[in-house]
Amino acid sequence: MSIAPLLRKVFLIDLIKGLSITFKYQAPKDCQTEQYPQERPVITDRFRGQPMMKLGENGETLCIGCNLCALACPENLIAMKSDRDPVTKKKVMVTYVYDVSRCMFCGLCEEACPTQSLKLGTGYEMALYSREGMVLDRKVLEHRTAPEPYEK
């Protein structure tokens, strides 16, 4: 019997070699984890997040009540009601309800809007305690802003 295999078993040389390779990968040189919420990820312009409605220079909504966004939505999440203004004879949006709870953020409603009033913004923090909070009306959509920075 040879002494070399016996020494390998006694001093566990193969085990030590394997563990050295394992521990080399356990302590990476650069950390890939984002320290959220202290460090926010960089959001690109093409990101589709929280829906919002743009307002014009005069502070009124740009929506003309055409209902194209509701027709384009594959999940039927948008409910809109519009009436004709008796003075100007133009369609005016009366109610607008957007249910974000089932939205898949496909952007079809944004593409269908002829006035570009509906926009899927860069907000991604939409966690709530109830489903009722996910149903957004016109006032909430018009007054959406950029996400607030984290403070400890």
Curated annotation (Swiss-Prot):
[4Fe-4S] cluster 1 binds at C63, C66, C69, C113. One of its GO terms (molecular function) is 4 iron, 4 sulfur cluster binding. SUPFAM superfamilies: 4Fe-4S ferredoxins. Binds 2 [4Fe-4S] clusters per subunit. NDH-1 shuttles electrons from NADH, via FMN and iron-sulfur (Fe-S) centers, to quinones in the respiratory chain. The immediate electron acceptor for the enzyme in this species is believed to be ubiquinone. Couples the redox reaction to proton translocation (for every two electrons transferred, four hydrogen ions are translocated across the cytoplasmic membrane), and thus conserves the redox energy in a proton gradient. It is a peripheral membrane protein. It holds the Pfam family Fer4_7. Belongs to the complex I 23 kDa subunit family. Its EC number is 7.1.1.-. Keywords: 4Fe-4S, Cell inner membrane, Cell membrane, Iron, Iron-sulfur, Membrane, Metal-binding, NAD, Quinone, Repeat, Translocase, Ubiquinone. Residues 53-83, 94-123 form the 4Fe-4S ferredoxin-type domain. GO terms for cellular component: plasma membrane. It is found in: Cell inner membrane. Its cofactor is [4Fe-4S] cluster. It comes from the Bacteria. This is NADH-quinone oxidoreductase subunit I 1. Gene3D superfamilies: 3.30.70.3270. It is an enzyme of class 7 (translocase). [4Fe-4S] cluster 2 binds at C73, C103, C106, C109.
